[in-house]
């Protein structure tokens, strides 16, 4: 009777050890495959992030160039306006002198 009782216990221990070994093997295989599967996804995310950063940098450079151009145009317009005003003042002084 004890031999019959010991056999199922031995069998249960052996089967549970087998199940544990299978689970460890499965997890080992999954863990070893995971980086291979996730690496391209991770690389794609990094590339996408770099593209976004590059786009942001390009946009900021374009905005900065546009602001510089606008500033140059405004400065040129201001200089032109000043020159025009000086010219008008000069003409006015000349006319004033001529009138006297």
From Swiss-Prot:
It is found in: Mitochondrion membrane. It comes from the Eukaryota. It is a single-pass membrane protein. Keywords: Membrane, Mitochondrion, Transmembrane, Transmembrane helix. The chain crosses the membrane at residues 13-32. GO terms for cellular component: mitochondrial membrane; mitochondrion. This is Uncharacterized protein C513.04.
């Amino acid at each position: 009777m004890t031999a019959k009782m010991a056999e199922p216990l031995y069998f249960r221990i052996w089967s549970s050890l087998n199940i544990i070994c299978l689970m460890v093997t499965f997890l080992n295989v999954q863990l070893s495959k995971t980086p291979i599967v996730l690496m391209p996804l991770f690389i794609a995310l990094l590339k996408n992030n770099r593209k976004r950063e590059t786009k942001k940098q390009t946009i900021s450079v374009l905005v900065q160039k546009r602001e510089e151009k606008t500033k140059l145009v405004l400065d040129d317009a201001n200089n032109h306006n000043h020159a025009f005003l000086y010219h008008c003042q000069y003409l006015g002084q000349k006319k004033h002198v001529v009138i006297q």
